[in-house]
Amino acid sequence: MKFGLFFLNFQKDGITSEETLDNMVKTVTLIDSTKYHFNTAFVNEHHFSKNGIVGAPITAAGFLLGLTNKLHIGSLNQVITTHHPVRVAEEASLLDQMSEGRFILGFSDCESDFEMEFFRRHISSRQQQFEACYEIINDALTTGYCHPQNDFYDFPKVSINPHCYSENGPKQYVSATSKEVVMWAAKKALPLTFKWEDNLETKERYAILYNKTAQQYGIDISDVDHQLTVIANLNADRSTAQEEVREYLKDYITETYPQMDRDEKINCIIEENAVGSHDDYYESTKLAVEKTGSKNILLSFESMSDIKDVKDIIDMLNQKIEMNLP
């Protein structure tokens, strides 16, 4: 099992955007030390509200790569459908080259109908556009060139410069956003990123569908290393941790899931993520790992209000990781 962090970068009330991003920078540079046994850090993409103030996660990842030496850093969910695929490929290839293989491309389809319309994409062909964009990006990263001729893109063969440092391009993960994406990923043996806000039943259903699809199409997934995102807030006082998470998530849940009961959704997240006292985090996370088959755990401590408490929890978890190293 490997461990890393992910950053949603929600801008909390009373906190500036500078402070929000600075907290991410401080945490990433902290765990880049050889003292820590965290391997990765990922930046979330979100648009048009304070419920995630990074609209360009590859750019943010590039900044963090320049500050670090050890960590592999990437986008958690670069939305490839609403960006030009050649541009995504150029940025990913450049970071792979400049970081000497430390960049990771985590990508996603577009879940927001508003963003699809805003960026002038057709909602009715969402999955087809996603797949077309990926093929262009993957061709560019694995061969250095792309020459698409499909319903959405048709242009002459172009070279993507600089070509990647890594032999087959940067490591890739795709967000498990729908059954269509999960089945598509299984056919390509692409590892999934399971979303922290999905309930365990949904995550398990996606994992089963992934395995079933791979088996049906004869795809070897023995080396696939899914990753599980987990909201973490630990406190000696369980209620303090829970209230901090409720406060942190309330606006995002209202924005993203307007059709759901907000409190019910947040309570489910609290129950199934690592939220509560120091004894509360293990069983729920262990169960999610078992149900999804994940080999990587990504943690977000951003709901914790005291940065010193964050360091203390990171140190505590780091000791536990160290005790279990082979």
UniProtKB/Swiss-Prot annotation:
**Swiss-Prot/TrEMBL GO biological process terms:** bioluminescence
Q: Which Enzyme Commission numbers does its entry carry? A: 1.14.14.3
One Pfam match, by short name? Bac_luciferase
Q: Specify the superkingdom.
A: Bacteria
Keywords for this entry?
Flavoprotein, FMN, Luminescence, Monooxygenase, Oxidoreductase, Photoprotein
Q: Name one GO cellular component term.
A: cytosol
SUPFAM superfamilies for the chain: Bacterial luciferase-like
Q: Listed GO molecular functions?
A: alkanal monooxygenase (FMN-linked) activity
Q: Which Gene3D superfamilies match?
A: Luciferase-like domain
Reactions performed catalytically = a long-chain fatty aldehyde + FMNH2 + O2 = a long-chain fatty acid + hnu + FMN + H2O + 2 H(+)
UniProt xrefs under InterPro entries:
Alkanal_monooxygenase, Bact_Lucif_Oxidored, Bacterial_luciferase_CS, Luciferase-like_dom, Luciferase-like_sf, Luciferase_bac/NFP
Subunit composition?
Heterodimer of an alpha and a beta chain.
Function of the molecule: Light-emitting reaction in luminous bacteria. The specific role of the beta subunit is unknown, but it is absolutely required for bioluminescence activity.
Q: Which family does it belong to?
A: Belongs to the bacterial luciferase oxidoreductase family.
* PANTHER family per record: BLR5498 PROTEIN (PTHR30137:SF8), LUCIFERASE-LIKE MONOOXYGENASE (PTHR30137)
- Specify the protein name: Alkanal monooxygenase beta chain
